[in-house]
Regions:
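Active-site-proximal loop/hinge segments that shape catalytic or ion-binding/gating pockets
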Residues: 423
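Short Gly/Thr/Asp-enriched flexible loops that form oxyanion-binding sites at enzyme active sites
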Residues: 74, 165-175, 431-434
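Short functional linear segments
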Residues: 1-63, 70-81, 88, 127-128
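C-terminal helical cap/extension that packs against the catalytic core
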Residues: 216-234, 251, 296, 352-417
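Short internal beta-strands
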Residues: 88, 210-216, 337-341, 362-371
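Nucleotide phosphate-binding/pyrophosphate-handling subdomain across enzymes
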Residues: 155-158, 168-170, 174-178, 182-183, ...
Length: 440
């Protein structure tokens, strides 16, 4: 039995109190043995707190990339219909408050604390009965449900934090499952190939419930797993209701969101006009986001081979547009500057190899992200050797995030188009440094 102290009375004490609960997100190695019991711990806590989602419609979103964007699409589309939503997402860009949103707005710590205090008796009862100690994610998921129910929110949107069937969110039975694009990530936990990862993540599928699957190389594997679990799989192609200007990546996410809501509203599907309104409202922070500055910056949290591939395509367009606007031609064309930061469990060599498609290669600065899973800047530079070979580019290694961000500003000052990518953690740090506090 662990002695759990009461939640703090003020936001200042919350980080230390939360740190007393195991956080898989901050630990290495992430292997199969360390993830067992995930949903069972959370389920026990929910039951002891008397928290039931039977009165709500629950949509669970798993996948390798596009989960957060799909949740944003769901929020926007639901808001067009005047529906109240609660969204549980991870990771956050700047503040932990971002991980729980009510009607698209982060819930401030001042409102989270009463929810934790209401959960505290259930935590104590569980320890007295010999329940396993909940992890940070178990606790945060239960807090999300507590807050959503107290606000009488009818639509709950759950972004799977890691994997699928072992994630804390799987303690909550969903009405609709979504599987976004699959890519190589967390291979020690999920599998060594995209097919193995797809098979693992597809296990969120529930008997008798639909699983909407992003079309791709692994979608057939996912559909097979879903069928074996009694779910109703549907592989989703690009939906014709989506505006033509929406990128391929966001079209995939929007198509999944639309089909999920079509299932909930079979008599009144969303229209093209409503989808366009949702697109116009969408704020995709840290996802191929252009921050006006000055100086202007292309910011992206890409961290898998496919998402870096999309970043490369966008950076090429961004750089070409910059050179045209500045009137640079021939030998005066600017190659740009790129700040890179990654996590250690993201297959860096394979992911970064996509940068070879940039011709010419931009100047590069690497930095270590200051989290336990962060990859050292020197190690990132070493992983870049096959990319930079023969290019004349030698990556600069920043000694700190501040130094890396300062390098970006200096490159902008000499007229280079600038960008940052490699991790949502990096995107959050750069965004906070780039924007005034009121806008970050």
């Amino acid at each position: 039995m662990v002695n759990i102290s009461p939640p703090p009375d003020s936001p200042a004490g919350l980080p230390d109190w939360l740190a007393s609960f195991t956080n898989w997100e901050k630990q290495l190695p992430l292997d199969r043995g360390r993830r067992e019991w995930g949903p069972l711990r959370c389920r026990k806590l929910l039951d002891r707190a008397g928290l039931s989602t039977d009165s709500c419609k629950v949509i669970q979103v798993a996948g390798s990339k596009g989960k957060g964007s799909t949740v944003l699409w769901l929020e926007a589309l639901l808001s067009i219909r005047g529906c109240k939503t609660a969204a549980l997402t991870s990771p956050h860009l700047i503040s932990l408050e971002e991980r729980i949103r009510i009607c698209r707005n982060p819930v401030p710590f001042e409102k989270l604390l009463p929810g934790l205090q209401r959960l505290y008796p259930a935590l104590l009862a569980g320890q007295a009965a010999g329940d396993p100690l909940p992890t940070f994610f178990d606790l945060w998921t239960a807090l999300f449900i507590e807050i959503a129910l107290s606000e009488k929110i009818p639509y709950l949107l759950l972004e799977v934090g890691l994997g699928g069937p072992l994630d804390s969110t799987t303690a909550i039975p969903h009405d609709v499952g979504i599987l976004t694009t699959i890519d190589l990530e967390h291979t020690a936990l999920l599998g060594d190939t995209c097919e193995e990862i797809a098979a693992e993540k597809s296990k969120i599928a529930r008997d008798g419930k639909p699983l909407f699957i992003a079309s791709g190389e692994t979608s057939a594997v996912s559909a097979e797993i879903a069928t074996s679990r009694g779910a109703i799989p549907e592989i989703c192609e690009r939906d014709p209701r989506i505006p033509e200007e929406v990128s391929a990546i966001q079209s995939t996410n929007a198509s999944l969101a639309l089909r999920a809501l079509d299932h909930l509203w079979p008599e009144s599907p969303l229209t093209s006009e409503e989808t366009t309104l949702a697109w116009n409202q969408l704020e995709l922070q840290g996802r191929l986001e252009v921050i006006p500055g000055p100086p202007e910056l292309l910011l992206d949290g890409a961290h898998t081979p496919a998402s870096i591939r999309a970043f490369v395509d966008e950076f090429s367009r961004y750089r070409d547009r910059f050179n045209r606007q500045q009137g640079f031609t021939g030998s005066n064309l600017k190659s740009g500057a790129l700040l890179l930061g990654m996590l250690r469990d993201k297959k860096p060599e394979e992911t970064l190899s996509e940068l070879k498609r940039l011709n010419p290669l931009p100047q590069i600065c690497t930095l270590g992200i200051p989290v336990p899973r962060g990859m050292d800047g020197e190690a990132i530079a070493e992983a870049l050797v096959p990319v930079t070979a023969g290019s004349g580019i030698t990556p600069v290694v920043a000694g700190s995030p501040e130094e890396g961000i300062d390098w970006l500003r200096k490159m902008a000052a000499i007229g280079e188009p600038i960008a940052a990518t490699g991790s949502m953690y990096l995107a959050g740090m750069v965004r906070q440094a780039w924007l005034p506090a009121s806008q970050a």
